[in-house]
């Protein structure tokens, strides 16, 4: 299982568009793909035509309250599943920050999924900030994809995320 974080601390650079389209392309090729919407705005979730579903975000797995596998929701596309985003993820930043191992909780939550080899790829659609959700995604990821636009502030955001990594 390969985990790819799609991240940039700057908003509006195409993280969600990249995440959703890459997930759809992988699924269309028969690759078992899980898209995790880590953004409280839940745009990846709505892009796939799904509503937010109470209790089905990454919130509880981040806090150790439930395994990731219980939060996976099928989409209408074969080979593509999602863990929807939810506004409650904004509160997860505060709760996870108080927890032990707060920067590696997502990586630990993925261990059972890696062992089961349920998915070939996991794509993490990150929020536009350098907060706890993004740092957990970076710690959990095998690869990092940083979309950016050809403008000064996008490059500035790239240098900030490079410093964090």
Listing of model-derived features with the role each one plays in the protein:
Residues 1-165:
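P-loop NTP-binding core
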């Amino acid at each position: 299982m390969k985990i790819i974080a799609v991240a940039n601390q700057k908003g509006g650079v195409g993280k969600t568009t990249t995440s959703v389209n890459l997930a759809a392309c992988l699924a269309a090729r028969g690759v078992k793909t899980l898209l995790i919407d880590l953004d409280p705005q839940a745009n990846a979730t709505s892009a796939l035509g799904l509503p937010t579903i109470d209790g089905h975000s990454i919130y509880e797995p981040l806090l150790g309250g439930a395994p990731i596998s219980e939060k996976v929701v099928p989409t209408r596309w074969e080979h593509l599943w999602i863990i929807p985003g939810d506004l409650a993820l904004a509160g997860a930043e505060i709760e996870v920050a108080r927890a032990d191992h707060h920067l590696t909780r997502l990586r630990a939550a993925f261990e059972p999924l890696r062992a089961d080899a349920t998915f070939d790829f996991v794509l993490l659609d990150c929020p536009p900030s350098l907060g706890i959700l993004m740092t957990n995604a970076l710690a959990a990821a095998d690869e990092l994809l940083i979309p950016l636009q050809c403008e000064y502030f996008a490059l500035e955001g790239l240098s900030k995320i490079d410093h964090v990594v």
